Amino acid sequence: MFDFASYHRAATLADAINLLADNPQAKLLAGGTDVLIQLHHHNDRYRHIVDIHNLAELRGITLAEDGSLRIGSATTFTQLIEDSITQRHLPALCAAASSIAGPQIRNVATYGGNICNGATSADSATPTLIYDAKLEIHSPRGVRFVPINGFHTGPGKVSLEHDEILVAFHFPPQPKEHVGSAHFKYAMRDAMDISTIGCAAHCRLDNGNFSELRLAFGVAAPTPIRCQHAEQTAQNAPLNLQTLEAISESVLQDVAPRSSWRASKEFRLHLIQTMTKKVISEAVAAAGGKLQ
């Protein structure tokens, strides 16, 4: 039995915001895959709970007429994987969701929880970065929209105040032609394991050149990151193996991995360069291009 000091089930989003404001120690419970572990270990910081699991305002995937997408923060990873909209418009996000844990976890774990947990290994963070998502955040002070790039502020930390709730992810319209994206995860096991290194890439091609490249890595720095030096190297560069090699060298200026029991810093640097080539090659192929 969990040792709750207080438990409140929010009836609406407004109710949840008020409950958070009235309970400064409260933690949100959506999927529960992180919070319940803390409760199991009797973490005193998780004894006050506001349950938002059943809030309709936090769920659903919608496509607007202009091609922009909205994904509710409490949407589960299984829902992301199975939805035709995300399959068509955000394939790297679907691939990342498919790499998370196992079916039982994906059935309950939420997209928003994975991002707000703040872990650099969060598998959904890198595709969210390459698709330039904005986060819709509600609080007693109103609504604000912030870019995903910069939302992670340190290990286990995000730019979210206690009385704020991440309500939805908003994705800008994606070009329909000559674009491709991919996600790749390296872990010690094929399933039920967190990333040793994770990455995602999105590219737009134009007449045999990189018109744009977006590259993101997880577990390559204290937070999930976009790789600015690598992206600049690709800008308007020819679509060939020499450019790919140059990008894999430039990416070393963007990353700062550490050694841990999972992998040494040196091995992670090797993985980063190797995975840069792999994920970009897959994104180029998805865009209909070929590296010569």
Curated annotation (Swiss-Prot):
GO molecular function, one term: xanthine dehydrogenase activity
Keyword Flavoprotein belongs to the record: yes
Catalytic activity: xanthine + NAD(+) + H2O = urate + NADH + H(+); hypoxanthine + NAD(+) + H2O = xanthine + NADH + H(+)
Enzyme Commission no: 1.17.1.4
Required co-factors: FAD
Pfam families xref list: CO_deh_flav_C, FAD_binding_5
Pathway(s): Purine metabolism; hypoxanthine degradation; urate from hypoxanthine: step 1/2; Purine metabolism; hypoxanthine degradation; urate from hypoxanthine: step 2/2
Classification via InterPro entries: CO_DH_flav_C, CO_DH_flav_C_dom_sf, Diverse_Substr_Oxidored, FAD-bd_PCMH, FAD-bd_PCMH-like_sf, FAD-bd_PCMH_sub1, FAD-bd_PCMH_sub2, Mopterin_DH_FAD-bd
Record keywords, A-Z: FAD, Flavoprotein, NAD, Oxidoreductase, Purine metabolism, Purine salvage
GO cellular component: xanthine dehydrogenase complex
Residues spanning the signal sequence: none
GO process annotations (BP): hypoxanthine catabolic process; purine ribonucleoside salvage
Domain annotation FAD-binding PCMH-type: ranges: 1-176
Residues that bind FAD: 27-34, 109-113, 165, 184
Physiological role: Presumed to be a dehydrogenase, but possibly an oxidase. Participates in limited purine salvage (requires aspartate) but does not support aerobic growth on purines as the sole carbon source (purine catabolism).
Subunit text: Heterotrimer of XdhA, XdhB and XdhC.
Name of the protein in its database record: Xanthine dehydrogenase FAD-binding subunit
Gene: xdhB
